[in-house]
């Protein structure tokens, strides 16, 4: 499943083909005892150069397709690498336990933290169970319960965002999807404890915002963050979903653009090839960033943190007319 999905991305085909050639040469060298060391070294050097060139020139839409891949690490892939000890907690205490939004308590370095995050599936069956990472009202209420627990016991909060958006089915609307997200926004501004939000893959619309209010917003290098998917934006503005490439460019969904615009605070580097190419290295880089930001935030008084958090989000949306260089 994962390989077939990767092959559907044209920009990855040269990399996958070269990786296949390296695998075949390695097998020949191993099983036929043929010395191919120089050839293998040469191919691996070519692969490193090719990966660098491809991933340095990704378009916004290519980044979106990349983070939608099944092998992209999810919240529950990162947690065992980041936390030395952790325990998943369940339920919103209202009869729901949404598997699309997970959370728990864990140990990050010397900090006891509460974490919540969207959870996508790894295959068709898992994606159906996880609703493709689209959380229901019960999921956001579960997240709120855990974050209130963190605030009560003075535990920092870490959120991990990776969703195409909140679930928009009739049942979700009946159960108060908009209200659940709105309450989370209000409450997250009021919490005294440090909050760090990290966009792991796809940060989509209100589904992302439901756990996206924090003192620091981190974003993985190839992740995207958008008010609407490029496909939806193209359909709304131009009545043509095929113009998703134009929409992706206009929406400024990449980490570099959002850093310039002040929507996020820090871009977290990924291994060449994306976090899916080396999950453990990607997790290590993210862990170091989280520890550094937590160390800074814990030095501030709660009132100072809340004021800075409020001011940060009040500034988002400021724009400058007639400044083409600013918007790229």
From Swiss-Prot:
Name listed for the protein in its UniProt record: Acetyl-coenzyme A carboxylase carboxyl transferase subunit alpha
Function: Component of the acetyl coenzyme A carboxylase (ACC) complex. First, biotin carboxylase catalyzes the carboxylation of biotin on its carrier protein (BCCP) and then the CO(2) group is transferred by the carboxyltransferase to acetyl-CoA to form malonyl-CoA.
Alphabetized GO MF terms: acetyl-CoA carboxylase activity; ATP binding; carboxyl- or carbamoyltransferase activity
Top class in the EC scheme: transferase
Gene: accA
Protein location: Plastid, Chloroplast
Pfam families documented for this protein: ACCA
PROSITE patterns reported for this sequence: COA_CT_CTER
Source organism (scientific name): Gracilaria tenuistipitata var. liui (Red alga)
Example of a GO biological process term: fatty acid biosynthetic process
Listed GO CC annotations: acetyl-CoA carboxylase complex; chloroplast
UniProt entry keywords in alphabetical sequence: ATP-binding, Chloroplast, Fatty acid biosynthesis, Fatty acid metabolism, Lipid biosynthesis, Lipid metabolism, Nucleotide-binding, Plastid, Transferase
